[in-house]
């Protein structure tokens, strides 16, 4: 863990709890992609399957528990409590293509051919594109609430803070995990366009709206 990865984790937590606050306060999940959140839940479950038998540190243990529990709760709210407010007609991204592609990549190029490492590689690829259904939904609706935009920007910040973390690991430890670097670049690019629009709208007091 580095200073930048810790900051990234804090931004990630802020994004999750900002979203939960928005959902609980407004009692709606309108504008949110259930498909994206189910993909993120799958990311955490497949990545942290070794949670109870490969103990690394108390920090990692607690963070993994929080990520799984909070994402599970978000999915529960969207599937049960707030289901009447879910915009299913806009959440139409074909996630089977994402899942199939990530599974193939995990089998072709895992860090090693063990079940845990294949699942870890799958989770890395999946996290890089799990936001696509949300971005696609946003593209279809054309706009979103400010709190949802804040959540997505916090996710952008989380990803952005991991860039100096990668640079540090390469420069100091000479350790490069090609899959993680490539997937991280893909994820950064996907969030990048959103961050530009966010800066031009929400940070200037305007309603978030995608350009026509």
From Swiss-Prot:
Origin organism lineage: Eukaryota, Fungi, Dikarya, Ascomycota, Taphrinomycotina
Protein name per the record: ER lumen protein-retaining receptor
Regions of this protein lying in the Cytoplasmic compartment: 22-35, 81-96, 138-149, 200-212
Record-stated family: Belongs to the ERD2 family.
UniProt record, GO biological process: intracellular protein transport; protein retention in ER lumen; retrograde vesicle-mediated transport, Golgi to endoplasmic reticulum
Membrane topology: Multi-pass membrane protein
Lumenal side: 1-2, 54-61, 111-117, 169-178
GO molecular function: ER retention sequence binding; HDEL sequence binding
Source species: Schizosaccharomyces pombe (strain 972 / ATCC 24843)
Record PANTHER family: ER LUMEN PROTEIN RETAINING RECEPTOR
